C-alpha cells in the first residue's frame, strides 16, 4: 500500500508581518490522485499516489506557485527494469488531478489566523498531469537496483568513455557490502540502474528529474537489510542498492541549473524495523 502526507508549517504573526506569509497560509487548493500499476497494470499493489498543492504568491501581485508530490512504488527484482519503465510511464499518463479531486483544507490553528469556512471549490475547471507544475517531487521505493555484468556510467551525467567503469559481478558487490565503507559504496554508484537508464544515449526514464548522485552523498544502500537486525546488517538474499529515492524537478530549471537546491540528503541508518532504510532531504525552492 502507499500513503503520502504533505505538511505545511505555520509561522506566528510576529514572524510574518511585513514578510512573506508561511506556506500554510498560502495554500489555495489541494488535489489528490492515485493510479495502480500492479497486476494487469491496474491493481494497487504497485502504483503511485499524488498531491497537487497550489500556493498563492509570497509577493503581492505575483503568480501562484504549484508543487506536486508523487509517492511511487514500482516493480521489484533486479531484472524488471523494463517493467519499472512501463509502470512509470503509466503513472505519468494516468495520474490526473481533476476538479473533482479537490480536498477540504484543514483549519489553521488559532491564534495564527481567523479562519474562513473550508471550501472544496476548485480554483479552475481544468485537469492537470503531474508535469503541470512549477516543482515536482517524486519519492518512494522506485526499486531500481544495481546492474551487474554491464559497464557503468558517470553518475553526474558526463560522457563516459568505454572502459571507464568496467562491468562488475555479484561477487564484487557483495565484497563491498561486507566492508560497509562509504567510500567503497560510492564506487558502485555508476552501476545504479536508474542512473544507467537516465543517461542512456536515448534516455529511457526519469531524465527530466534530478537524481542525487550517490557517489557525492556517500549514502549506504537503502536495501536490503535484516529487519530488526543490527543497524548495518545487510541481507545476503538480495543485492544491495538504492531503490528508495527522492527526486525532483523544476520548470525554472535550465542546463546545469536545477533551480531546486539540495541542502541535505541522507538515509536514516538507525531505523531497523524494515528491510529498507528511510531517505530524507532538505531542499530550498527558488525565490
Task: Give the predicted meaning of each segment.
Residues 1-42:
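Active-site surface patch of divalent metal-dependent phosphodiester/phosphate bond hydrolases
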Residues 3, 47-49:
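Residue-level marker for the onset of beta-strands and adjacent loop->beta junctions
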Residues 5-6, 32, 65-76:
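Active-site-proximal beta-strand elements of phosphoester/diester hydrolases
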Residues 18-21, 42, 49-56, 62, ...:
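Catalytic lobes of large eukaryotic enzymes
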Amino acid at each position: 500500500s502507499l500513503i503520502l502526507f504533505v505538511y505545511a508549517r505555520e509561522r506566528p504573526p510576529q514572524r510574518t508581518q511585513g514578510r512573506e506569509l508561511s506556506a500554510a497560509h498560502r495554500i489555495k487548493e489541494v488535489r489528490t490522485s492515485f493510479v495502480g500499476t500492479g497486476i494487469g497494470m491496474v491493481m494497487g499493489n504497485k502504483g503511485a499516489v499524488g498531491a497537487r498543492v497550489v500556493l498563492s504568491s509570497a509577493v503581492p501581485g505575483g503568480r501562484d506557485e504549484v508543487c506536486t508530490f508523487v509517492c511511487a512504488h514500482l516493480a521489484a527484482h533486479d531484472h524488471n527494469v523494463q517493467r519499472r519503465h512501463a509502470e512509470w510511464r503509466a503513472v505519468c499518463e494516468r495520474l490526473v488531478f481533476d476538479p473533482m479531486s479537490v480536498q477540504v483544507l484543514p483549519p489553521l490553528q488559532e491564534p495564527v489566523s481567523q479562519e474562513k469556512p473550508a471550501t472544496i471549490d476548485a480554483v479552475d475547471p481544468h485537469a492537470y498531469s503531474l508535469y503541470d507544475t512549477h516543482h515536482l517531487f517524486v519519492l518512494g521505493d522506485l526499486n531500481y537496483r544495481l546492474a551487474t555484468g554491464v559497464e557503468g556510467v558517470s553518475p553526474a551525467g558526463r560522457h563516459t568513455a568505454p572502459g571507464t567503469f568496467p562491468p562488475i559481478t555479484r561477487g564484487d558487490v557483495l565484497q563491498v557490502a561486507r566492508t560497509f565503507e562509504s567510500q567503497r559504496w560510492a564506487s558502485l554508484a555508476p552501476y545504479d540502474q536508474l542512473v544507467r537508464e537516465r543517461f542512456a544515449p536515448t534516455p529511457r526514464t526519469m531524465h527530466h528529474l534530478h537524481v542525487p548522485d550517490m557517489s557525492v552523498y556517500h549514502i549506504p544502500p537503502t536495501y536490503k537489510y535484516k529487519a530488526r537486525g543490527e543497524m548495518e546488517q545487510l541481507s545476503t538474499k538480495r543485492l544491495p542498492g538504492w531503490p528508495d529515492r527522492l527526486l525532483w524537478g523544476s520548470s525554472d530549471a535550465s542546463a546545469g541549473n536545477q533551480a531546486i537546491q539540495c541542502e541535505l540528503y541522507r538515509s536514516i541508518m538507525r531505523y531497523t524495523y524494515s528491510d529498507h532504510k528511510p531517505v530524507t532531504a532538505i531542499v530550498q525552492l527558488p525565490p
